[in-house]
Every structure is written in structure tokens, then in C-alpha cells.
Amino acid sequence: MTKKQFTKDIIKLDDVDKTCNKIINKLKSDVYSLLGRKGGIVGISGGIDSSVSLALAVKALGSENVIGIMLPEKDSSPDSKEFALKLANKFGVRTIEENITATLEGFGCYKRRDEAMSRVFPEYNPLDFKSKISIKQNVLMQNMPSVFSLTIIDKNGLEKSKILPIREYLQIVAASNFKQRSRMSMLYYHAEANHYAVIGTPNKHEVEQGFFVKYGDGGADVMPIGDLYKNQVYELAEYLEVPKEIIERTPTTDTYSAEQTQEEFFYQLPFHLLDLLWYGWENGYQPDEVGKALDLSAEQVKHAYQTFERKNKTTEYLRMSPIRDYK
């Protein structure tokens, strides 16, 4: 079969209504018939992915059978709650707020994270500084493993950044992952208490590039947008009439105390390019053809492909089920 010519519109949904109804019908069947549950639990953060996931759940299961769970902690943006409530009001779902700060303090999440940050910046104190980790490399200009930096920002807005040593990087990430895993546990509490399913919110890039926490936000019973590119998620958001403010909001990690976009933290590319380059890579399009369509050089596309290959391989363990064949 001849491949379609690569263009900037190649991942645009041919029929948004058809795609949406297919997801809704499958989600309804999976939750009620395959899983035998009575409804769905969605963790809502006011972001585009959780908003579309909730909207799809409402269409599939009915608003009376969907509960939106807000799971803030002390580093969360106050905007997240505002947008989450606006979303819930739009789709008529009941919400429950579970502040997980005390849970995270019990795990030592903040203490363990701050210990590692203080080894990099001895002056760091979470009362005086905000912090974040990020990748400062350009995917299109170089092919090398991601190098993370720690940035601290004082009360006057002065920033300092240093490349993270591997020990401190691993400790910061391990400590921060308590957040996603605590949220997953709380979602399953409410799911089991109501005999509901947990509706996961990761999109295609998060699943396939490993931008999720194993047994954290990767823990769910169903993932209705798990095969959708980010721009396709936005297409569904428009179709489902997700509040405009949420659609226009820049996707963030909402994990560290300093503001941080998903592009800055992990993807290293704007979503309009990320989607198209990933499609080209996984469907075997030659770098020169993709580059011509996107006004990039073949070399830039090759760098992106090599990064995708590396991320997909190094995060494969996140997508694996527990290994059982030891007989």
C-alpha cells in the first residue's frame, strides 16, 4: 500500500465526529461490559488531556456516573483548581478534592527532593526559592542523551541553573514521583469505593515517549486518548466544547514549585512539530521528505528521529507488565 504524501495536515483527523464516537462507544463498552464497573473516576487538573478524558467519559457513561477528583499539593498551581472546577461545571460532574500534601510529607517527598537540591545549590531553601528541573537541549540541532538542569528562582525572580549530577537527578525524580503515585492511589480508592473504573489521561506522546510515572499517572483501567497525538486531543477538545480557557492554556507539568511547560521539562519541541516529526518517524517517512514539508533540513529531522528512537527504547520498561516467566 502506497503511503500518503507527507504534509503538515497528515495527522489532522479526517472525521472528528467519527473518531469521537468510536472512542465513546468503546469506552462505554470497556467500562460497563469488559470491566464490569458502574462509572468512571477521572483525575482532573485543568489541563487539556484530563479535560478531554473527562468529556469523553461523560459522553460515554453519563455525567451522573463520572466523578472528577482534584488532587492538589503545596506545589500545585492555584489555577489548576480553578480550571478543574470550570471543567466539572461545564460537564455537570461531581467533584471531590483530596489535598495530598500531608501524604507526601509522610513519604518524605519534599524532604528527599530538597536534600538533593541543596547538594547542588547549598543556599537552596524551599521557603525562599522556587525550583524546577528541565532539559535545555535543542532536539533539532544535536543528537545526544537528555541532560537535565536544576533551576532555582529567588523571591526577586533571579534565576540560577546548574547541570544536575546523576545522583541528585535520580533522587529528585524519585521523590517527585511520589506525587503521581499518591494520586493514583487516591483515584483507586474512590474507584473501588464506588465500583468505578479509573479513566487514565495520558496521550500518545506521554505513553510512547515515557512521559509518565509507572504505577502513577500510568496506572489506569482505560486510556481513551492514549493513541491520540496532542493536536488530535485539541481537535477533540474543540469538538467536545471543552472550555476555551483550558484549550488556550499552555500545558504544564504542575510538579515543581516554579512554573514549567511540558516542552521545557521533557519534549524539547513545540507540539505542532513534535506530532508531525513523531508521525514521520513511526511511519517510516524519509527525513528529506518530512523536512521539506516542515521547512527543516534532513539533518534536523534525523536528529529528532534519533531522539525519538532513544526515548522509546530507554522507556520501554515503563510500558512493560511485570515479568512472570521464571519457570
Q: What positions do the PLM features span?
A:
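ATP/NTP-dependent adenylation/nucleotidyl-transfer catalytic domains that generate, transfer
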Residues: 1-42, 52, 56-59, 64-67, ...
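Conserved G/P- and acidic residue-centered "switch" motifs that form tight phosphate/ATP-binding loops
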Residues: 47
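Acidic, Mg2+-coordinating phosphoryl-transfer loop and its flanking beta/alpha structural elements
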Residues: 72
